[in-house]
């Protein structure tokens, strides 16, 4: 066993203590009316706050009290006890979800500071949201950061800062300003620099910023804008290039602002605003990578509405890799996205610069899943979704191949019947009405792919799939790539 495997095993063993609740527990916390069982020795070893808290007195009952907003410990008379006789410590400084994340990090040294994908959240109205950079995800990260600072867990604070720095690049400007305020309050210079530059580039006038930020922060943003403008002018080598360079910079800033406004509109499902930007401001959806962004970060309904505008090329290759939206959807293993793209004539045979098709991506993922038990780069995957994505793309490729064959075999004057791009039962109102179409598609699949489907289903269904840690099983949620190389 390697050192990495040994540490991972140790981490899981400690985490199991927390998961098993009352097993060997000698301290219980009450958070938002719910009991959380823990172990003093682990908390004291991992957090200076808890070490001081538990060493408050020689009498065990003296270490029980209220962890309130000010960090003051109080010993109320008649403190309640849990079922195992251990005194219960009320916690009012953080919420239940954040407290569990904090304990998870203290026990295992690792934690995912992201809400569950597609989970209904009180401050996120987007149905099917991935919660990668929405207001709910930002709020959870900010609450976790505050808790990490409060309980003196600096490693968790640093981890959360990195998470927030990644989130704000795609977050709405309102959420960026929330992070900006938190970074200033908690003296996080790097996060402050990132957020202040994003707010400065947003193009929002000072009077609008003043509604969300203290006046001294607005002044710093304006100072930053002024310095940025002076720096751009000082970089111009010759006077006669001044106006030309200034115009180029202004145009680049304007395009950047357009793209940010477009992304905020897509995040809030406001496709009508995007339509107005296309018609009134000349926004180029392909150059702005609107469809790529929507596939990766928005719901199926938003992607469908964006495609129906008719202003975006569904097969547009983006970035040095040349990935199309269908490549992105295949990497995400998202049947909804794959289906809506194929519905709007996405090409299943389109290739990247490296000569990779969406079908190649799904076949590789399936092969890795079958023969390795896990997919490199993905922490979790739902086999049924992988199988459905593969079926959709392979069926579309097969139909397209037949159409091309018919066109080559028939003279131009002959009349041929054009088959639909593919048939997808997810788009029908009643599954029963599409059973014949499904059977037709599945019958056309080649033997190799059919064996892949059977093996994938049999492996998962029989519970024979295992991993390096003794074959743990569960119903994993699909992992979503938060960044793509396009």
Curated annotation (Swiss-Prot):
An annotated Gene Ontology molecular function: zinc ion binding
Cellular component, GO annotation: cytoplasm; nucleus; plasma membrane
Tell me where it resides.
Answer: Nucleus; Cytoplasm; Cell membrane
Q: What does this protein do?
A: May act as a substrate-specific adapter of an E3 ubiquitin-protein ligase complex (CUL3-RBX1-BTB) which mediates the ubiquitination and subsequent proteasomal degradation of target proteins. Transcriptional co-regulator involved in the promotion of leaf and floral meristem fate and determinacy. Necessary for the development of stipules at the base of petioles. Required for the abscission of senescent organs, probably by regulating the cell wall disorganization in abscission zones (AZs, e.g. pulvini at the base of leaves). Promotes slightly root-cap border cells separation from the root tip.
Placement of ANK repeats on the sequence: 257-286, 287-316, 321-350, 354-388
Give the UniProt record's GO annotations in the biological process aspect: induced systemic resistance, jasmonic acid mediated signaling pathway; nodulation; plant organ development; regulation of DNA-templated transcription
Mind telling me which PROSITE patterns this protein's record contains? ANK_REP_REGION, ANK_REPEAT, BTB, ZF_C2HC_NPR
Its family remark reads: Belongs to the plant 'ANKYRIN-BTB/POZ' family. 'NOOT-BOP-COCH-like' (NBCL) subfamily.
What Gene3D superfamilies does UniProt report for this protein, alphabetically?
A: Ankyrin repeat-containing domain (1.25.40.20), Potassium Channel Kv1.1, Chain A (3.30.710.10)
Q: Pathway, per Swiss-Prot/TrEMBL? A: Protein modification; protein ubiquitination
Put simply, this protein is called BTB/POZ domain and ankyrin repeat-containing protein NBCL
KO phenotype (gene knockout)? Defective in stipule formation and impaired organs abscission in the spontaneous mutant abs1/Abs(-) and in mutants Delabs and Abs2(-) associated with the lack of extensive cell wall disorganization during senescence. Slightly reduced separation of root-cap border cells from the root tip.
Tell me which residues bind Zn(2+). Answer: 124, 129, 131, 134
Q: Where is the composition biased (Low complexity)?
A: 406-418, 432-441
Composition-biased stretches (Basic and acidic residues): 466-475
